[in-house]
Swiss-Prot record:
Its main location: plastid. It is found in: Plastid, Chloroplast. One of its GO terms (biological process) is mitochondrial translation. Gene3D superfamilies: 3.30.1320.10. The gene is rps16. It comes from Mesostigma viride. Keywords: Chloroplast, Plastid, Ribonucleoprotein, Ribosomal protein. InterPro entries: Ribosomal_bS16, Ribosomal_bS16_CS, Ribosomal_bS16_dom_sf. This is Small ribosomal subunit protein bS16c. One of its GO terms (molecular function) is structural constituent of ribosome. Pfam families: Ribosomal_S16. GO terms for cellular component: chloroplast; mitochondrion; small ribosomal subunit. Transmembrane segments: none annotated. Belongs to the bacterial ribosomal protein bS16 family.
Length: 84
């Protein structure tokens, strides 16, 4: 099963995350199928590749809790429901 979740980058005490599509059996920082955006919690910046995220969600991908919250804030689920 494919999951949309965060992959940690950055240095100690200064995290930076990429939103990725990955096989659910892989480790957190394993090889991603596709990188779909980034999230910087310190600066409060988020950039998402919405068309590719919608593609993976339509294909049955599950989201982690944090990525689900990010997608709700970016109103991706609203766009997905309008397409259905």
């Amino acid at each position: 099963m494919v999951k949309l979740r965060l992959k940690r980058y950055g240095r100690k005490k200064r995290p930076f995350y990429r939103v990725i599509a990955i096989d659910s059996r892989c480790r957190r920082d394993g090889k991603a199928l596709k990188e779909l955006g980034f999230y910087d919690p310190i600066a409060g910046k988020t950039q998402l590749d919405v068309p590719n995220i919608i593609f993976y969600l339509k294909a049955g991908a599950q989201t982690s809790e944090t990525v689900g919250n990010l997608l709700q804030k970016a109103k991706v689920f609203n766009q997905l429901s309008l397409l259905n």
